[in-house]
């Protein structure tokens, strides 16, 4: 016990002076160029991206069913995960967006979701239960399910770590736990739930889709347009969105010249936000799968089979009048599985009686869809968002302009409140929202648009302007969300920042954010998400900012804010070790960094053992012992050797029994 106490005291005593010193000497560049930092920044950019709702005609949905998909939203969804810009798209991107890109493989993302996606996880569960009771569940691809469901996340996160442990050997690298941290964070952030206090999951645009099978295309388009305007969205979601139109030509059953003529008529009426694409309606499957019911082994064989091993004569149409289809094997690709599936969706899919089958697609269709999504994003979505930001800035200048205009507005607001006892501001304390047409809601949307456009500096300034308004109105959910994204904005900026001047503000915003999310709103998801994201981003900054990041993450490990289960406690302790194990961290001496990583690995080993993950406990012990066995501290080395037998499964079972 004395050795352990001495060990902890000595390790923590090294952190304290370094943390205090960091607020005085932080001048290097704040840009993190190591592999973990690049992946984390890309992950954050992919999380907070524009959402596009799908409104497809009946003929489109029938076309997709013949092609092997549940609906058009399921078909287009994975093509929005990774969108790479071409040289012709640069003119549509602002200088701030280009400056925020820090590596060659940087990409953008958009989320394609069905119209019914505007619902919270609780509502989605109720609808799913009702469908199950009424026999409406089927074996088709899982529909979109929102994120934020903690129960399903906890189940899948444990499976994620177990798979990582089983996939490796005992010789894990020092920074080997960084990849599981990213996978865990991606699972947490997938399916960003619809919320009133942030507009990232609110629709930026809507894609209206019809096919060449439609007998009255213009009338159908106008009907779908009216349905969008009359959709029962919550009043905190604005319907001022971009409308984009897609015409699908059936390559197998319709005349191309006739389809092009119809599309040109549509384009003259609807404008430039229209696109024409050619797709085949035949569902391409392999003979072993051409049965009435697809079994799991056949599905897995298709998913895992190398493309070169498939012969062209094994493919046929799945329609009733099945005919051989001539395809060259090298011109076929597996349909990409969506990367950003929420834990609720993954769990629902695993509970189905049969797994979804992702068909094969001709390479021309895959490339055509990629080109369409790229054109839509860079030529329409981004320019639309930029125009919105400029228009909102002009409209809101009287309230959020220079110092003089803001003082005049503040005095007017003060006197109007004094002379009107019924004035309650724009915030509704009963429904806890600002309606979409209110200035505060527009300002928040303007900041979120700037963030999604990667103009982090401007977004930070806007969040800073509206934070005081949320505080005065006691709009706690808006205030906490504003502080969360404001911290992320500051840490995502591709420029030098001085932690000497910023750390006091960061700590204040962080503490208030955690208090509101955990105590006032009792939201485990938002508390956990905000702490994990901001801590990991802060750990990338130079010098000893990593010590502040560790202290942030350690705050939710203390009893009080939120109730963590044993697995989450073990994971977060190991995450702190993983942050210190980042070899390419700037400004921290290698020996100091490795000792702190070893301390947290050793500290978390016991937690892993107690929650039944003895293999993880052994991995953490090995990573810590690599450092301590060479430390020259004989008593500590002996303590580590004495600790190893206590991490075994037999010791845990015996200790539990007693």
Curated annotation (Swiss-Prot):
Q: Which InterPro entries match?
A: TRAPP_III_complex_Trs85 (IPR024420)
Single GO biological process annotation from the record:
intracellular protein transport
Positions of disulphide bridges: none
Query: Entry's Pfam families?
Result: TRAPPC-Trs85
User: What subcellular locations does the record give?
Assistant: Golgi apparatus, cis-Golgi network
Report the GO terms under cellular component: cell division site; cytosol; nucleus; TRAPPIII protein complex
User: What are the protein's UniProt keywords?
Assistant: ER-Golgi transport, Golgi apparatus, Meiosis, Transport
Q: Which family does it belong to?
A: Belongs to the TRS85 family.
| Known role | Component of the TRAPP I and TRAPP II complexes. TRAPP I plays a key role in the late stages of endoplasmic reticulum to Golgi traffic. TRAPP II seems to play a role in intra-Golgi transport. Has a role late in meiosis following DNA replication.
State whether it acts alone or in a complex, and with which partners, per the record: Part of the multisubunit TRAPP (transport protein particle) complexes I and II.
Record's protein name: Transport protein particle subunit trs85-1
Gene source species: Schizosaccharomyces pombe (strain 972 / ATCC 24843)
């Amino acid at each position: 016990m004395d050795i352990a106490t001495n060990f902890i005291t000595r390790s923590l005593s090294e952190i304290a002076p370094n943390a205090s010193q960091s607020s005085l000497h932080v001048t290097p560049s704040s840009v993190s160029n190591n592999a973990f930092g690049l992946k984390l920044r890309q992950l954050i950019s992919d999380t907070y991206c524009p959402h596009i709702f799908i409104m497809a005609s009946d003929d489109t949905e029938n076309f997709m069913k013949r092609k092997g998909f549940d609906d058009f939203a399921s078909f287009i969804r994975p093509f929005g995960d990774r969108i790479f810009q071409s040289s012709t798209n640069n003119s549509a991107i602002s200088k701030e967006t280009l400056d925020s890109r820090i590596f060659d493989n940087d990409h953008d993302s958009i989320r394609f979701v069905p119209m019914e996606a505007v619902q919270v996880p609780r509502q989605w569960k109720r609808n799913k239960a009702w469908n199950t009771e009424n026999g409406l569940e089927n074996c088709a691809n899982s529909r979109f399910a929102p994120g934020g469901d903690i129960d399903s996340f906890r189940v899948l996160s444990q499976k994620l770590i177990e798979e990582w442990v089983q996939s490796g050997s005992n010789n894990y690298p020092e920074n080997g736990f960084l990849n599981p941290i990213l996978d865990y964070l991606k699972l947490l952030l997938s399916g960003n739930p619809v919320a009133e206090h942030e507009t990232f999951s609110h629709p930026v645009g809507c894609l209206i889709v019809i096919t060449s099978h439609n007998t009255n295309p213009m009338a159908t388009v106008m009907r779908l347009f009216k349905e969008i305007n009359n959709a029962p969205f919550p009043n905190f979601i604005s319907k001022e969105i971009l409308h984009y139109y897609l015409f699908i030509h059936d390559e197998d059953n319709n005349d191309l010249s006739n389809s092009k003529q119809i599309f040109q008529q549509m384009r003259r009426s609807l404008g430039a936000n229209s696109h024409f694409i050619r797709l085949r309606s035949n569902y391409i499957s392999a003979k072993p799968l051409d049965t009435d019911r697809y079994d799991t082994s056949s599905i897995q064989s298709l998913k895992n089979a190398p493309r070169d091993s498939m012969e062209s004569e094994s493919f046929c149409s799945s329609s009733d009048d099945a005919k051989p289809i001539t395809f060259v094997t090298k011109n076929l690709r597996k349909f990409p599985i969506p990367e950003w599936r929420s834990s609720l969706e993954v769990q629902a899919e695993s509970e189905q009686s049969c797994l979804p089958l992702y068909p094969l697609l001709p390479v021309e269709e895959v490339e055509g869809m990629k080109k369409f999504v790229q054109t839509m994003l860079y030529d329409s979505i981004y320019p639309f968002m930029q125009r919105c930001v400029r228009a909102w800035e002009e409209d809101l200048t009287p309230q959020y302009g220079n110092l003089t205009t803001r003082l005049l507005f503040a005095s007017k607001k003060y006197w109007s409140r004094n002379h009107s006892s019924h004035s309650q501001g724009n915030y509704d304390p009963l429904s806890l929202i600002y309606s979409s047409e209110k200035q505060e809601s527009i300002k928040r949307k303007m900041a979120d648009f700037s963030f999604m456009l990667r103009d982090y500096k401007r977004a930070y300034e806007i969040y800073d302007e509206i934070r005081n308004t949320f505080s005065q109105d006691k709009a706690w959910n808006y205030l906490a969300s504003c502080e969360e994204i404001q911290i992320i904005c500051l840490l995502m900026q591709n420029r030098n920042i001085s932690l000497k001047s910023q750390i006091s503000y960061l700590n204040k915003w962080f503490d208030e954010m955690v208090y509101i999310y955990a105590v006032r709103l009792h939201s485990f998801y938002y508390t956990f998400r905000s702490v994990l994201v901001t801590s990991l981003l802060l750990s990338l900054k130079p010098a000893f900012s990593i010590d502040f990041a560790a202290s942030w993450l350690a705050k939710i490990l203390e009893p009080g804010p939120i109730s963590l289960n044993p697995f989450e406690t073990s994971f977060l302790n190991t995450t702190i070790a993983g942050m210190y194990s980042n070899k390419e961290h700037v400004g921290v001496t290698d020996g100091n960094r490795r000792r702190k990583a070893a301390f947290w690995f050793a500290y978390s080993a016991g937690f892993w053992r107690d929650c039944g993950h003895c293999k993880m406990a052994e991995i953490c012990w090995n990573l810590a012992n690599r450092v301590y066995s060479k430390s020259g501290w004989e008593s500590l080395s002996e303590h580590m050797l004495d600790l190893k037998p206590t991490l075994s499964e037999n010791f845990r079972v015996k200790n539990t029994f007693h």
